[in-house]
Amino acid sequence: MKKKWVIRLLWLLVLAVAAIIFWFSSQNGEDSTNTSSGFISFLLRLLVPGFEDKTNKEKKLILSQLHFYVRKGAHFTEYAMLGASLRLLFHVLNLRRPILWAWIAGTLYACTDELHQMRVDSRIAMWQDVGIDSAGVLVGALLVTLWLWHRRKRKRT
């Protein structure tokens, strides 16, 4: 009974992460840019002393320089979360080669995400994002694998 509860919870986690990714992909180009810019501004105010004292022109320049990297980092991170949750689910389901299945499922979701973005106003599909997303899935799955291995190793000693 406990295992069924864990499986349901992990399915819910996978679906929640997929829904968050879908929500971000559903934002039109302007909203997506505003979300990214707001996040970057928040981080800069938090981490860079004197950022608030810069002129608006200097702030915009810094934002534009970081925008690409933050967006790609967000892609990688959200898909790492998907890969980690898929890997945990497949572990509990006792699938053979759970890393491979997590990577395949996450990469297929990344492909459908790019197709979805083609249908959103002022958004385009960028197929190199699938590569970034796929790498994120793999890293997330590998991190969970390392955690499970470490946990199992500690139980033996």
Task: List where the protein language model places each region.
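Interfacial helix-loop-helix junctions of multi-pass membrane proteins
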Residues: 111-132
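Membrane-helix interface segments
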Residues: 6-9, 93-103, 123-127
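Short, charged juxtamembrane terminal tails flanking transmembrane helices
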Residues: 154-157
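Hydrophobic transmembrane alpha-helices
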Residues: 83, 87, 91, 137-149
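"…centered on the first transmembrane helix and the immediately adjacent amphipathic helix/loop
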Residues: 1-77
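Lipid-exposed faces of alpha-helical membrane segments in multi-pass integral membrane proteins
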Residues: 9-23, 104-112, 135, 139, ...
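Membrane-interface loop-to-helix entry segments
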Residues: 68-82, 127-135
